[in-house]
Amino acid sequence: MSTYLIGDIHGCLDELLALLAQVNFDPQQDTLWLTGDLVARGPASLDVLRYVRSLGPAVRMVLGNHDLHLLAVYAGISRNKPKDRITPLLDAPDADELINWLRRQPVLQVDDQLKLIMAHAGITPQWDIETAKMCAREVEAVLSSDSYPLFLDAMYGDMPNNWSPELTGLARLRFSTNALTRMRFCFPNGQLDMICKDTPENAPAPLKPWFDLPRLVDPEYSIIFGHWASLEGKGVPEGIYGLDTGCCWGGDLTLLRWEDKRYFTQRAFKAEAEINNNNGFAAGKEVQH
């Protein structure tokens, strides 16, 4: 029985299956944690969703910003961009079923036994574990409700970017969504910067990666995140694990086996990397909310 954690898949099903074959993944015994962004940019978003859903309780996943964007496109709130390559998913006969399954997935995973926390972008330094759980539950509740299109319509935007327990309504939900699925850099007081997409060494002062600021999360817990492909999993402090290594840009799909902290990688299959790079994209660029 092993715990496997995998970074952003982005529709790269063949690489996912090849990576799981390396470790002889057994859904009857093993648990698979996924950092979100299952869809977009890669060639097989539809089949990735079908496969992950078929694994049932063997999977513990979180939603990423591209997954939320897919929900908004399907709801008619956002435009379907050809570069995302999700049209086969939108047109699939089981699209309704898959979308309704997807919107009921969490935005935060916490395992108190393994002392593991997973969110697509990470945990804002302004939150402790209990605040993160509370805010995640609020987002999950509205996503799984009949009023979810109202939330999806309101989630796009960079403000508010400073946490306060006094935040309410859609503003509170937007902050929580940005913190859990879009965050990279923060100001020294923990306030989110939603503009800079650079690597840490090229970020303007006084911005710092969220994981380099003092945090309120219990240090006994490790934090798993994806989202930030240009990090290539490097430069993070002890107890923080960045697993997005840019498979859909020609990089790797990365798996971490938790029990022995061993990494496994699967290089992107060349043809798909060329398609994305020829379309003018660069590693680490994300859907803009």
UniProtKB/Swiss-Prot annotation:
Belongs to the Ap4A hydrolase family. It comes from the Bacteria. One of its GO terms (molecular function) is bis(5'-nucleosyl)-tetraphosphatase (symmetrical) activity. The lineage of its organism: Bacteria, Pseudomonadati, Pseudomonadota, Gammaproteobacteria, Enterobacterales. SUPFAM superfamilies: Metallo-dependent phosphatases. This is Bis(5'-nucleosyl)-tetraphosphatase, symmetrical. HAMAP family: ApaH (MF_00199). It catalyses: P(1),P(4)-bis(5'-adenosyl) tetraphosphate + H2O = 2 ADP + 2 H(+). Keywords: Hydrolase. It holds the Pfam family Metallophos. Hydrolyzes diadenosine 5',5'''-P1,P4-tetraphosphate to yield ADP. InterPro entries: ApaH (IPR004617), Calcineurin-like_PHP_ApaH (IPR004843), Metallo-depent_PP-like (IPR029052). Its EC number is 3.6.1.41.
